[in-house]
Structure formats: structure tokens, C-alpha cells
Design a protein with these regions (language model features):
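Periplasm-facing N-terminal accessory domains of Gram-negative outer-membrane beta-barrel systems
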Residues: 2-6, 13-141, 160
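Periplasmic N-terminal accessory/gating domains of Gram-negative outer-membrane beta-barrel systems
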Residues: 89-247, 266, 273-284, 288-297, ...
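Solvent-exposed loop/turn elements at secondary-structure boundaries
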Residues: 167, 550-577, 581-738, 839-856, ...
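Hydrophobic, lipid-facing positions within transmembrane beta-strands of outer-membrane proteins
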Residues: 180, 211, 237-239, 289-293, ...
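Transmembrane beta-barrel wall of Gram-negative outer-membrane proteins
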Residues: 253, 283-364, 385-413, 578
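Gram-negative outer-membrane beta-barrel transporters
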Residues: 544, 682-830
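C-terminal beta-signal and adjacent terminal beta-strands/loops
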Residues: 678, 691-692, 696, 812-845, ...
Length: 926
């Protein structure tokens, strides 16, 4: 069965099983509690009404059950008033209840005897502790997004969340043109999930952890970051970023936001010790700006709302230690334009629809190529990124059926088309050269890429809700395809060592690959309130099928035209993931909770894992190169063809029949306590263990085909055993995707968090201490050279982290705010490149090995403090807020990337934390 045919069948089955899409469950909140009379007895039959301007329908209602319990689900974030009424009793109204995303606010009430028209109104603080939910999350509402200085991007904002680590820290929006990976509590690089209003908008290509889209800050009402004990509707365990969009409203409102900086507004943080390491010029800002306009309101009050926003932002940065042919420092120049329109329709009282269209265009003048990773690039060897088509389209429906049934449905699509073309100034006949010792690329980009993809999400859920029990069942279907087409100058890559000819790669371009995937999930999530205990058991089933459709490639320099048959169902995973969360309201007062859980998650996967099995994929031979005339241009007569290794035509790969989907078990336990009226603290333990990790091995060359050879380890002054491949296996390739049971990774950590809101101030923050240790799983481990020192610190291990932010309203409408990011630097590797000059007769020609375990060396401590000062001017309903931001207040210059190859350039930085940056701007709102 083809993937396309399978997709249609799955969608049909999903439609029959449930009414509609489900990830939206992660977007919504709830209000729950118990109603009693003045003697303490429970009151059944009480009508409970939640009202908010955030609801286009205005109000949502429920009735207490025989235990006096009620629960109102599927509420949007906002400020609510809750009214309790029962004949023979005075009505009670609680006002000013702030409800963030994915939070259950416990609002209890006591009714006294009296006439119904007699009422008691109470204005009080919102609950700070969710005593029913077991999910760990942090919410950045619109006030925080506007107040705390960040790069106005979900990834930059996420760097303020306790426990979250990333490879490159953002300084004042200088890194928001890319999408860095976020990890939390030892999660995988793959396990980032992006949701728009609760609907997953993930790219099915690459590793599955990208969106292929850049987000408009003006669209966001708030952003929720869920990090542990996730429910069954969550696809994986890691950082779940849920972006809640504005819905418009019954009044017209809008904003204009402008901010920017240039190179004269940044401090010099190039120190002498960095210069001594060979860092001649630091990475720094050339110019950065952000313009964001929003407008929302009613088309028809209480019936149809609209919200639109346009954003144009740019970050042009000078690259560290990278120069043009004229000696000028190279610039990474880029900008993004985005326009979004959103409609919310209340068709009938119990049926709501939302329509969302978001178009984004990115241009990047000098992007590093996608094939070779190097610390230094001649700008002429970069690529130009241009966008042909990139948008998000989403339709969502939700319905309240009586007092106990809720249904939701959504469909999402994301096409991605962009080109990574050669730099226009590159010489016509130039070919790419890679110096493996200096870690530098020159001449021209190694290749040009044409990328295209289509993604679709269909999902649905039905919820049954009573006061003490709720059950949700649903389905999620994620399907699509991803394709890359490759071309190269001369179909060759020249490799040098410190400027001396070493070898060449003869490449089978024009080539490429296209893969398809269908990921289907069924889930059930239960929640039982049993006295002071709430149990949240869940079960998730997933089926993931990956295929390679039929495809072809034209003739190249070294290869003829080629046609390849389809390979259907290469991967066919069926997994079951149980999850159990709990929460104990210790004193039954909604202020103290002990919570935690045990959860199994599949690892998020993209179709990239079957690319090595695609016969059209890029492949090459590595051949010795003897540059006899010394011109550093490889002629055919200088290529020693008899000693080539590898293959120009990938042999048909295989998937081990026993291949398992990688998964993880997560263990959490934490104590949360509200102290006084305004402060909540928590302390928790987080554990994670990965299993069933896989890699692609060359089964044609087993580990027994290697002979040990002893060489000197230049770092330890001891011997190091490396392995020489049997010449009889030269050129033999049979890739097999296989699970290696001996591979594992695990994390253990503790975390303290504080969240305070006062009349004039707010503060949030956390301290995380943890260690992420295990095996790397990215190489052919049939080759024993890749097992050398393979166990060490993994991922973005950062032993100590401090994250936080604050805001304080000074007299005269002056707002002072800031944030802090302190962290241990990430672990480094030390790579020894073994060549024939070290081991004469080395069959592989070149072999990389780790001289020491990853983490024996590490990057330095990062200390980032950002501040913002805002003055508010008001005139009628309009506010003008000029803004002054200072990022990296202490001018930290911690190295974030450096040459890790042993040689003359070892330790030479290629990037550091950007220096102190001042940005000025302002906001007009009405």
C-alpha cells in the first residue's frame, strides 16, 4: 500500500472514531471547585457561570453534581468572573480571576440562605497553584511578553524558562532569524513540539523537530511552555510550546511597535585572551530592527471577530573571524516579513469556528551550507536563501453539547518551499574546498539545495466532563512529505589539511531525496478527583509509517541518469505509551500540592531517518588527491582512483526488522506551595531515561573488518588505539537502520522555582541542577573508531542554570524590568583527524576519532542580564511607551562555538556571546 493510500484510509478511520482534532486540548484551561452551604454540606444542582471578554460567546455554564463539584473546561486564557446561583440561597460572584493557558483554577464557593436576588461579590486574587493538574508549565502572558526584555520570539522567550537549555543564547533579538533547539531536563533535540492554539504545526521532514516557519509576536496572546508530566494528547516529552493567538474582541484595539539598534549601539567585548586564541574579530551586530502592527475587533459584536498583524524584522550580524576577499568582516544578512489574519465566528451559541492564515517570507543573503559543518566560512562559500511559498492555514471548530460534552476539530496545513542558491559573486568555475584542520570552507558553497515540503494535521477529541471526573478521547493524524534536490559545482569537494591537498569527494549530484510519512495517534486521557487527590491516567497509541516514493535523478559528472522504485512502509512503528500523573491538595485549601508522575513518551521523529536508505540521496567516494602541480585544483590525473572508498551509488539500504522507535521514561515529583497572597514556590525532582536508540550502520563492513593500531594521543600523552579498515572491504556499503540496545542516555536533576506577583511588581525564576549523560547515537557504530570515548555528557548538558525575570512599576508611570540567564557552558568534544600521515596505509584515508569523552572540556560560564526601562504616556484611550533596552548588561563574552579539531586551530573561537547591546523603540496602543 502506498503512503498516500494509507493516509486516506487513516483519515477516514480517524473521522469515524472521533468528531474532531485534539491537540487543542493543550491550549485550553478550566475552572473547577466545590460548592458548599454555610454548614459545610455540599450543594448539588448549583448553576455555575464563567464570564469573560475572552469568550466570544460571553459565558460558559455548568451545574454541580451530587458531590457539589463542578468543572468548566475549554476556556480561553483571560480574566473571568464566576457566579454561583441556587434557588433559596444568596448568589455569590467571584471577580478578577486570571486564567492562564492549560491551568485549572480551583474556585470554591459557600452559599448562605437568602433570596436569589441577594448577591455577594468578592474580588480576590487568582489561584497560583494548580492542585488538580500534574503538568509542569510556565506561561508567558502578553503582559510579560511586552514587559520582559527578550527577542520577541518563542525560542528567545523560552530561554527564560527554568530548566531550558539551548546552544546559542539570544542577545537582544540577534539570533531570532534561526530556530534554535530547546531542551529541558535532559530531553532530546527531537522533542520540541510547536502548537498554534493547541494544534501541532510540526514539520514532518528532517528530524521532525522543526516548524519550517517563523512566528509573528504580535499574534500571541500568551505562550505556554509545558516541560514535564505531559498528558496523553501530548505527542512527546520535551519542551511543548503552545502559542495562543489573539481572537479579536468586542472592542477595536491595536498596537504599533518599533525597535532597533546598529553597530554603534553595541559594546566591544573582544578581550586579549580571545585574540590570543586566534579570534581576530568577534561576532557583533551590524543592524537589527523589528516593526510590528496589530489591529483587532468585531466585525459583528458577539458573533464575528477579526485580528490581523503584520511584522517585518531583521538581524544583520557580523560573523566572528570571517572575512571577505577584500578583508572586510563578513555579514550574515537576513530579514523576514509576515502577515496574519484570523477570524473567530460564533455560528450558534454552542458552536465556534476559527480561521487562521499566516504568510511568511524569509530572505537570507549569506547562510552556511546545509552539508558541511565548519567553524569558518568564506562568505563566498555561503548560500542565498529565498522563499517561494510558506504559509500556515488552520480551521478549527469547537462545540459544547449540553453541560457535559465538549467536541473539537481542526485541520492544519503548512507548505514550505525555499532555495539555498550559490552566492552570485562566486566565480563561475570555482569548486568548494574544505580544510579539515582549520575547519574552513572556501571557493563556493559545497552544494545548492532546493527544498519543498507539505504538512497536514488532522485531529479530534470528545470530552465528557462532570465536577469530579473528566474523560477525553481523541485522534491526531500528521502526514506529509519532504524533498531536497542537490547540485554541486563540478560534482566534487576538495579536502585539504592546513592548506595541503589531502583528498577529494566525488559526488553523485545531481541528486536528492523525497520521503513521506503518516503519524497516527489515538489517545484517552482521564482525570478523577477523589477527595483531595486527583489522578490523571492516560494512554496513547501511535502508528508511524515512513516510505520513499519512486523518483529519478539526471546524469552527473560521475554518474549516469538514474531511476529508483518506490520503497513503501520502510518504517512501520506501533507503540503504546502509558502515562500517570497525580496531584494531592495537601490541606484541601488550594494552596499546597504534591504532584508528579511517571510517563512514557515516544521520541519525535521525522522522515530524515530513512534518507540514508534513499538511493537518490547524496553519496560520494573519498579518494586520495596528489596535487602534483601545487595549484590546489584537483585534476583527474591527480585523483588516486584505485584507493577510493565509499560509493557513488548508495546500495539499497535496509531497516532491521527489529527496529524500535526510541522512547523515554520520565519520572517527576514536586512540591508546590502558595505563600501568602502573592507568592508560589516549588521544588522538584526530574528524571529521564532513553532506550531503544538507533543508528545507521554499514552492515557490509562489520566491526571484525577493522584491525587495531596504536598511536599517540596528543591530548593525554598516552597511547590511543584506533582501527584500520580491511582493504578488501573498501567501497563496500550496505546501510542498515538498526536499534542498538547498549545505547542509553539518562538525566537526573532538581529544580527550585519562585513566582511572585505584587501590586506593583512581578518576579519569576528558577534554579536547576542536573546532569545529562550517556552514549552518542549519530555514527556508524560498526566502525569501532566511533565507539572510542563515545560515552560522556550528551545533549545541551548544563549542570547549573539560573533563569528568571522581573518587572516593577515605579512612580510617574515608569516601568523597570529585566531578566537573568546564568548557565554552565555546554560540553565540548576533541576530535583527532587520523590521516595516512599518522597511519600509513590507512584504508579510510581519513578517520575522525574522539580523543577524550565529550564533556572533559566545556565552554565557559554564561552570565546574561538584560534590562528594560519604559515610560508610559496616556491620552484618552491611547498609550505611548518609549522603550530603552540594555542586553548583556555585563558585556559577557563567553565562547559559544570553537574549533574542536586537534591541530593548530584547536580552541580558536568562531562565536561568542554578543556584547552589550542597547535598543531603543516604543509602542503605541489603543
Amino acid at each position: 500500500m502506498t503512503t498516500s493510500g494509507f493516509t486516506h484510509r487513516i483519515v477516514l478511520v480517524a473521522t469515524l472514531l472521533t468528531i474532531a482534532p485534539a491537540p487543542s486540548a493543550l491550549a485550553q484551561s478550566a475552572i473547577a471547585g466545590v460548592v458548599r452551604d454555610s454548614s459545610g454540606g455540599v450543594l448539588p444542582g448549583v448553576s455555575v457561570e464563567a464570564a469573560s471578554a475572552a469568550l466570544i460567546e460571553g459565558t460558559r455554564t455548568a451545574v454541580t453534581d451530587t458531590a457539589g463539584s463542578y468543572k468548566i473546561e475549554n476556556l480561553r486564557p483571560g480574566v473571568y468572573a464566576v457566579t454561583f446561583t441556587l434557588t433559596g440561597f444568596r448568589s455569590v460572584k467571584r471577580e478578577g480571576i486570571g486564567l492562564p493557558t492549560s491551568f485549572t483554577a480551583t474556585i470554591n464557593a459557600e452559599l448562605s440562605l437568602g433570596q436569589l436576588q441577594e448577591s455577594v461579590t468578592v474580588t480576590g486574587e487568582s489561584p497560583l497553584v494548580d492542585v488538580r493538574g500534574s503538568v509542569s508549565q510556565s506561561v508567558m502572558n502578553r503582559e510579560r511578553l511586552d514587559t520582559i526584555p527578550t527577542g520577541k520570539d518563542p525560542f528567545a522567550v523560552g530561554q527564560l524558562i527554568a530548566g531550558v537549555t539551548t546552544q546559542t543564547p539570544d542577545v537582544g533579538g540577534t539570533q531570532v532569524m534561526q530556530q534554535p533547539t530547546l531542551q529541558v531536563h535532559g530531553s532530546s533535540n527531537n522533542d520540541n513540539v510547536f502548537m498554534l492554539d493547541g494544534v501541532q504545526i510540526q514539520h514532518i521532514g528532517f528530524g521532525g523537530n522543526q516548524t519550517g516557519f517563523y512566528f509573528n509576536d504580535g499574534l500571541m496572546e500568551e505562550i505556554g511552555y509545558q516541560t514535564s508530566s505531559l498528558p496523553a494528547e501530548a505527542p512527546v516529552g520535551g519542551v511543548q510550546i503552545n502559542m495562543i493567538p489573539h481572537d479579536g474582541g468586542n472592542t477595536y484595539h491595536g498596537t504599533v511597535f518599533i525597535t532597533g539598534a546598529n553597530d554603534r549601539m553595541q559594546a566591544d567585548n573582544l578581550s586579549q585572551n580571545l585574540v590570543d586564541l586566534g579570534f581576530r574579530k568577534q561576532n557583533r551586530v551590524q543592524s537589527v530592527y523589528d516593526v510590528n502592527v496589530t489591529l483587532g475587533g468585531p466585525v459583528r459584536r458577539d458573533r464575528l471577530w477579526f485580528f490581523g498583524t503584520f511584522r517585518r524584522w531583521s538581524a544583520n550580524n557580523f560573523l566572528g573571524n570571517t572575512f571577505t576577499s577584500t578583508g572586510e568582516q563578513a555579514v550574515d544578512d537576513q530579514h523576514i516579513s509576515d502577515a496574519t489574519i484570523r477570524f473567530t465566528l460564533q455560528a450558534k451559541k454552542n458552536n465556534k469556528f476559527s480561521f487562521h492564515y499566516d504568510r511568511s517570507i524569509k530572505w537570507r543573503g549569506h547562510r552556511p551550507n546545509n552539508w558541511l559543518t565548519a567553524s569558518l566560512n568564506d562568505p563566498i562559500s555561503d548560500v542565498v536563501q529565498t522563499t517561494q511559498l510558506n504559509y500556515i492555514g488552520e480551521i478549527k471548530w469547537s462545540s459544547t453539547i449540553g453541560n457535559r460534552l465538549l467536541a473539537e476539530a481542526a485541520m492544519f496545513t503548512l507548505p514550505v518551499n525555499y532555495t539555498l542558491g550559490f552566492e552570485p559573486d562566486a566565480a563561475g568555475g570555482a569548486v568548494a574546498t574544505f580544510d579539515q584542520i582549520r575547519s574552513a570552507i572556501s571557493g563556493v558553497s559545497p552544494r545548492m539545495d532546493t527544498n519543498s515540503a507539505r504538512m497536514f494535521t488532522y485531529a479530534g477529541n470528545v470530552s465528557y466532563v462532570t465536577g469530579s471526573h473528566s474523560l477525553k478521547v481523541g485522534t491526531q493524524v500528521r502526514t506529509g512529505w519532504s524533498q531536497e534536490l542537490f547540485t554541486m559545482r563540478g560534482d566534487i569537494l576538495q579536502i585539504t589539511s592546513n592548506g595541503v591537498a589531502n583528498s577529494v569527494r566525488l559526488v553523485n549530484t545531481p541528486s536528492g531525496h523525497k520521503e513521506e510519512g503518516v503519524n497516527t495517534a489515538l489517545f484517552a486521557q482521564d482525570s478523577w478527583r477523589l477527595g483531595r487527590w486527583t489522578l490523571n491516567p492516560g494512554l496513547r497509541y501511535e502508528k508511524y509509517v515512513m516510505s520513499i516514493p519512486a523518483q529519478s535523478a539526471p546524469a552527473g559528472t560521475w554518474t549516469p541518469a538514474r531511476d529508483f522504485a518506490a520503497q513503501n512502509g520502510i518504517v512501520n512503528w506501533n507503540t503504546v505509551s502509558p502515562r500517570l500523573g497525580f496531584s494531592w491538595d495537601v490541606f484541601d485549601d488550594g494552596r499546597t500540592a504534591v504532584k508528579g508522575g511517571v510517563s512514557r513518551y515516544d521520541r519525535l521523529e521525522g522522515v530524515a531517518i530513512i534518507q540514508p536508505l534513499n538511493q537518490r540521496n547524496i553519496s560520494f567516494q573519498t579518494c586520495p588527491w596528489s596535487d602534483t602541480n601545487g595549484d590546489l585544483i584537483a585534476q583527474n590525473s591527480e585523483i588516486v582512483s584505485a584507493r577510493c572508498t565509499g560509493s557513488l551509488q548508495p546500495t539499497l539500504g535496509n531497516v532491521d526488522p527489529g527496529l524500535k522507535r526510541p522512547h523515554q521514561w520520565e519520572y517527576t515529583a514536586l512540591l508546590q506551595r502558595q505563600i501568602g497572597r502573592f507568592t508560589a514556590v516549588s521544588v522538584g525532582y526530574y528524571g529521564r531515561r532513553f532506550a531503544d536508540l538507533y543508528t545507521t550502520v554499514n552492515a557490509a563492513v562489520p566491526s571484525t573488518a577493522y584491525t587495531p593500531v596504536t598511536i599517540a594521543n596528543p591530548l593525554t600523552n598516552q597511547t590511543l588505539t584506533i582501527y584500520n579498515q580491511d582493504p578488501a572491504t573498501r567501497g563496500a556499503v550496505r546501510n542498515v537502520l538498526t536499534t542498538l540496545p547498549e545505547l542509553e542516555q539518562h538525566y537526573n536533576g532538581v529544580e527550585l522555582q519562585v513566582n511572585t506577583r505584587l501590586n506593583r511588581a512581578t518576579m519569576f525564576g528558577g534554579l536547576t541542577i542536573g546532569r545529562d549523560y550517556g552514549d552518542q547515537d549519530s555514527n556508524d557504530l560498526n566502525n569501532p573508531n566511533f565507539r572510542i570515548n563515545n560515552t560522556g555528557l550528551v545533549g545541551f548538558d548544563s549542570t547549573y542554570q539560573v533563569r528568571g525575570g522581573f518587572s516593577y512599576r515605579l512612580p510617574a508611570d515608569v516601568q523597570f524590568s529585566g531578566s537573568i540567564r546564568e548557565a554552565t557552558g555546554l560540553p565540548q568534544m576533541r576530535i583527532l583527524i587520523v590521516t595516512t600521515s599518522i597511519v600509513p596505509g590507512l584504508t579510510q584515508v581519513t578517520q575522525n576519532v574522539q580523543a577524550v569523552p565529550r564533556g572533559d572540556y566545556g565552554y565557559p560560564w554564561q552570565n546574561l542580564v538584560d534590562l528594560r526601562l519604559v515610560k508610559v504616556f496616556k491620552s484618552g484611550g491611547t498609550k505611548f511607551e518609549p522603550t530603552l533596552d540594555v542586553y548583556n548588561l555585563f558585556n559577557n563574552n563567553a565562547v559559544t562555538n570553537a574549533v574542536t579539531t586537534i591541530g593548530s586551530s584547536l580552541g580558536r573561537p568562531s562565536a561568542i556571546v554578543m556584547g552589550t547591546l542597547v535598543r531603543v523603540g516604543g509602542r503605541i496602543s489603543f
